[in-house]
């Protein structure tokens, strides 16, 4: 079970940008392979993704430095260590880096090794990855949060909010939830086509049509849910990612950044009123980053106002980091945390954040990034931690389907023991 070889390489992600892939080979010849995702809209407190900055190569986005850090600095340190010592390996890499944001070696270097080690160890023990990470009490299949309309930084549509998601909460199983989501996705395509709108898909496989605004997007989704034969608010709920840090400046939520002259400028109080108005009008039960990552007071007020009837997910606010999550718990900000492995940069720290959240009654949403690969590790992490929710894009693009298909396999393997997540978190 000892590590014999670690090899990193530069590969391309779903956006055609370079990312890091790592192979960890054990003495027995068993290998674990992992590749690292990357985000388009990133929280300012995220762990650092090391890019080369050489404009002559991939427009400066190369990751050869991170690859070299794995091959020349991390590998010599870890070779000979037991692959079963995940915490020891992760903390050895953190010590080797020596910074809070992993800016020396790069979170993309450390994470690639961390995930590949876990995969190698699981293979060595002949266990599925979710079982190795989570132990014997892993049984909750996540409710998918499917991003079917893109706005904000993920599209050219004049809508400030970044994602409009469907949550098939009324399904009896993950398999059926996935089917419901796919049917709504195809119904939405027809709704948009009938209006002469674009059905081209964005980074995460959702549509990015030139809609009139937020309410138009929500009404289009409701029309699609009904057209697919489901009841909005019962079978399928709606979730939104406002990504409001992207349009927050000097205490003002400035919608004109994405919506042009039609967009409003709102104070924190007005932003809270607006979000409350939307959840009263539409079947929305989850809002991510409704307030800016730096507006802690706004977050507290939003949580006091609607936290009892809506899941309020902190993404940029918490960046999968226990220090920021602890602050949020203490101040009463949000009631849920988005979990992105590359925001923090190691498996151990990811699991620490999930454990802290669950211990304090916060829900967790395991999440992809907009730049993904065929690596489906987050599907296993969602089940391993009984997260109950996963956000991994729309119902198109193989980089998104890889995660959904892995969840289908896991549910099949769990058989009658599998519980579809929403029953647990409602």
From Swiss-Prot:
Q: Does the keyword rRNA processing apply?
A: no
Kindly state what the record says about how the cofactor is bound.
Binds a second Mg(2+) ion via substrate during catalysis.
Gene Ontology cellular-component terms for this entry are: cell surface; extracellular region; phosphopyruvate hydratase complex
Gene3D superfamilies the record matches: Enolase-like C-terminal domain (3.20.20.120), Enolase-like, N-terminal domain (3.30.390.10)
Q: What is its main location?
A: cytoplasm
Task: Look up the record and name the pathway of this protein.
Answer: Carbohydrate degradation; glycolysis; pyruvate from D-glyceraldehyde 3-phosphate: step 4/5
- Name the catalysed reactions: (2R)-2-phosphoglycerate = phosphoenolpyruvate + H2O
The entry lists its GO molecular-function terms as: magnesium ion binding; phosphopyruvate hydratase activity
Top EC class, one word: lyase
Q: Which cofactor does it need?
A: Mg(2+)
Indicate where this protein resides in the cell.
Answer: Cytoplasm; Secreted; Cell surface
Residues that bind (2R)-2-phosphoglycerate = 162, 340, 369-370, 391
Q: Which residues bind Mg(2+)?
A: 241, 288, 315
Q: Quote the EC number.
A: 4.2.1.11
- Name the catalytic site residues: 204, 340
Alphabetically list the UniProt keywords: Cytoplasm, Glycolysis, Lyase, Magnesium, Metal-binding, Secreted
The record's section on PANTHER family has: ENOLASE
Which purpose does this protein serve, as stated in its record? Catalyzes the reversible conversion of 2-phosphoglycerate (2-PG) into phosphoenolpyruvate (PEP). It is essential for the degradation of carbohydrates via glycolysis.
UniProt family annotation: Belongs to the enolase family.
How is this protein named in the record? Enolase
């Amino acid at each position: 079970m000892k590590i014999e070889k670690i090899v990193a390489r530069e590969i391309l992600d779903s956006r055609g940008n370079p990312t890091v892939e790592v192979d960890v080979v054990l003495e027995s010849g068993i290998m674990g392979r992992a590749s690292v995702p990357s985000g388009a809209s990133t929280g300012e407190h995220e762990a650092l993704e090391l890019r080369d900055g050489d404009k002559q190569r991939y427009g400066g986005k190369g990751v050869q430095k991170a690859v070299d850090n794995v091959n020349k600095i991390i590998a010599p340190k870890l070779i000979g260590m037991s692959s079963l010592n995940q915490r020891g390996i992760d903390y050895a890499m953190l010590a080797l880096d020596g910074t809070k944001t992993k800016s020396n070696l790069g979170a993309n270097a450390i994470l690639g090794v961390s995930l590949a080690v876990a995969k190698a160890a699981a293979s060595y023990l002949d266990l599925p990855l979710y079982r190795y990470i989570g132990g014997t009490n892993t049984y909750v299949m996540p409710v998918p949060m499917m991003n079917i309309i893109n706005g904000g930084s993920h599209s050219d549509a004049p809508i400030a909010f970044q994602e409009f998601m469907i949550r098939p909460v009324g399904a009896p199983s993950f398999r059926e939830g996935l089917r419901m989501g796919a049917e709504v996705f195809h119904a939405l395509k027809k709704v948009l086509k009938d209006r002469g709108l674009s059905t081209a898909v964005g980074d995460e496989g959702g549509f990015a049509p030139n809609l009139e605004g937020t309410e138009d997007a929500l009404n289009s989704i409701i029309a699609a849910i009904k057209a697919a034969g489901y009841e909005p608010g019962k079978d399928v709920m709606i979730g939104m990612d406002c990504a409001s840090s992207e349009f927050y400046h000097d205490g003002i939520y400035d919608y004109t950044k994405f919506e042009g002259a039609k967009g409003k400028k709102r104070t924190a109080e007005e932003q809270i009123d607006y979000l409350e108005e939307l959840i009263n009008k539409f079947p929305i039960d989850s809002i991510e980053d409704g307030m800016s990552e730096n507006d802690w007071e706004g977050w507290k007020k939003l949580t006091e106002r609607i936290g009892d009837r809506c899941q309020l997910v902190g993404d940029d606010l918490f960046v999968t980091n226990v220090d920021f999550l602890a602050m949020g718990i203490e101040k009463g900000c949000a009631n849920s945390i988005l979990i992105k492995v590359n925001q923090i940069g190691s498996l151990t720290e990811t699991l620490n954040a999930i454990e802290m959240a669950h211990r304090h009654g916060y829900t967790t949403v395991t999440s992809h990034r907009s730049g993904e690969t065929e690596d489906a590790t987050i599907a296993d992490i969602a089940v391993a931690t009984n997260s109950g929710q996963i956000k991994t894009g729309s119902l198109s693009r193989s980089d998104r389907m890889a995660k959904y298909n892995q969840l289908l396999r896991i549910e099949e393997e769990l058989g009658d023991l599998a519980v579809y997540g929403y029953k647990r978190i409602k």
